[in-house]
UniProtKB/Swiss-Prot annotation:
One of its GO terms (cellular component) is mitochondrion. It is a peripheral membrane protein. This is RNA-binding protein RMD9, mitochondrial. Monomer. The gene is RMD9.
Amino acid sequence: MMLRRNAVRSLKTMEISVSNVVNSGSIAMLRGKLANVVLSDRTYHSSPIFHKNVPKGVLDKKNGREQRKTEQNVFNVDPASPWRHELLSFDECVSSALKYSTTPLQNTYKRIGNNQLNKNPSFAMFWDSMGRAMELYYSLRESPDFNAYRVSRLIHLLHNGLRSTRDQLVKLSRKPDYDSQSFHKEMMNFLCNSLKDISDDILIGKVSVSGYGATHLLTSFKELSFDDDCIRIWEASKNLSDETTSQAFQEPKVVGFMLPLLYAKTRSLTEPNELYNQIIQSKEFIHPNLYSGLIKVFIKAEDYEKALSLFGQLCEKAEVRNYGYLIETHLSFIGDSKNLTLAESFFDKIINDEMPYKIILQVSTVNSFLQNIWKAQNDFDHVYRIWEKAVKFYGNTVNPGILSSLNNTFFTIFFENYINDNINGFRKLQEIITFYSGVKKIDEPFFNVMLTRASIWHERSIIDFIDKNYTLYHIPRTIISYRILLKSLGSIDNTNNEEILDRWLELVKKLNELGQQYIANADLSALRDATVVWSQSKRDEKVFSAKAKGTPATTTTTEDDIKVPKPLENLKNEDSTSNSEDRIELYLKILKRYTPYFRATKQVYRYTTGCAESYPILNEYLSGYSDLSAEDIPVPQLHSFIAKEQ
């Protein structure tokens, strides 16, 4: 099924004048033209068939039959082959694991908690099958029957495992689950090493690969941020004597993937322009990934006329099974376009649900859009307007992590905008909280992000204000907020050791309540930031001030050197001010008192001598660390912690 012809005519009408519009800078005209684009066709959007996973064979019966015939041929094994048993075992391992992973692993992750994940039979079987497949790979790569399709399916499987593992590591980074993190990091190393071994074998001609496998291989390296490796592999493939592999890396879908990477490195439009002219003159529909790659390049190059022209062809010629490429390029117009009016027009089409295809608005795209607005215009009102639209659009339908990422970008810009105007900034902050609470229930990450970014104000009152809002909005606190509240004390002067110690004890009690057995690095880092980092900043300020005045600086900081900022209106507090020596002494005492509850002895080195490498002020106190008495530091009753013998 093609996109409707009458809808495509609207897009073509826009393309004719878009060049003049862009060149003349008539933003209003561009916006008006784009408003009539194919994407406004609501009738087609309501067609239920467009949202179903239509089997490939239904769309292209001839290609489907040919594919099944090809698969039967590549899986045939000569009964007399000495590799027969291993080949059949390999095929079974890969097939079973692929079947499991293409019913996304996310479904399994949702059904069972992270603590039980590694014990789940299906989950374990997936990783066992993958591990067994790699073992067989190292044996079978010498076999003449180990063809390009088998290698490609293995790469596909590794790519699936890579994506699921990366997703889990992102989720676990927000949770104190050391064992699960350790497992997934181990799997990540296994996957990276496996992909590297296969790519090395491909480049020396030991194994072959199809375009299907080449795409998964390069995409895997791209997702690992190994862009240079992608380019190295692709360039080397041109000179391979293995014709199957060499041609595979030159297939349109692979070239389409590589185009944005190559442009990012060379900034050359010679080849993209040549490919563009070939596509325009050709009557055949080339692989949509080539269109997608070219569109991304031309958006980056700010050649929007060509980008929109190709997008129009993709809309006209793409079949239902290609809708993912339409979505991908649509998001590129939002996140990568420097023409903010063009980007906002594509953004609004999603927000207003005017798409002829189902689309998920990726938060990374919105984040890029917000950053582009701020960088180009320095217009916070525009940023705020887009953020409001996005929050309303997401509402309560997305994972909290999605909004946490969006809010992190937004509040980074917010505090940059109000860095020297905390009075008006605080009023705006109250307005933001009121708006947000009217759209969805405020959760802990919202205030966590706000509190983290608010440290730039060095204002005690904002910390107290946000702290009270956790209670006001009945938000259950996780260990994350306890760490942030402790860490935030390192951004202000008007606190004292008693408060820092109280915050530390609250953190430890929360860890005990959660059943944690050890003090984690994240806990010690929060304590370090509240004490050592603050002390180092005071020392640096004093040295800088002395240099500016042309007077020698002393090596210690006194209370007279510390200036307490004026609190926000109507939010006064009377906390006393601690000095650098007091905070560092408290830091070292807490470290010493709680050392038995560290997971590893190397943590002591990391947060003493290791810490002093970044914060030299600590060196002045380490010589007396071994003789320091920490008996006056309390330790609450700990039921879950495991104390180590000293």
